Curated annotation (Swiss-Prot):
Function: May bind androgens and other steroids, may also bind estramustine, a chemotherapeutic agent used for prostate cancer. May be under transcriptional regulation of steroid hormones.
Tree of life domain: Eukaryota
The gene coding this protein: SCGB1D1
UniProt similarity note: Belongs to the secretoglobin family. Lipophilin subfamily.
Protein name as catalogued: Secretoglobin family 1D member 1
Organ and tissue specificity: Expressed in lachrymal gland, thymus, kidney, testis, ovary and salivary gland.
Species annotation: Homo sapiens (Human)
Predominant localisation class: secreted
Length: 90
C-alpha cells in the first residue's frame, strides 16, 4: 500500500506542477507501462529515453516490487492516475 501512495504522490508532483500542467504523453505511457506492462515490454519502452544502464536497472528493480501488487490494484491506480492527468490537462 505504501508504494502505491508514493507513486501517486510522485505522479501528482510531476504531472500537475504549475509551470506545466499538461501531462507529457511519453510520461503517461511510461507510468502505465510501469504499472501494467510485462518486464520485456517495459524495458523496450524505457529504451526511447536513452537512460544510463544503471538507471534502467534501478527502475526494473522497483518494477519487481510493483509487479508483486495485485493486477486489479495496479489497474485501479492506472485509472486514478488517468483521471488526475485528465484534470491536469484542462
Amino acid at each position: 500500500m505504501r508504494l502505491s501512495v508514493c507513486l501517486l504522490l510522485l505522479t501528482l508532483a510531476l504531472c500537475c506542477y504549475r509551470a506545466n500542467a499538461v501531462v507529457c504523453q511519453a510520461l503517461g505511457s511510461e507510468i502505465t507501462g510501469f504499472l501494467l506492462a510485462g518486464k520485456p515490454v517495459f524495458k523496450f519502452q524505457l529504451a526511447k529515453f536513452k537512460a544510463p544502464l544503471e538507471a534502467v536497472a534501478a527502475k526494473m528493480e522497483v518494477k519487481k516490487c510493483v509487479d508483486t501488487m495485485a493486477y486489479e490494484k495496479r489497474v485501479l491506480i492506472t485509472k486514478t492516475l488517468g483521471k488526475i492527468a485528465e484534470k491536469c490537462d484542462r
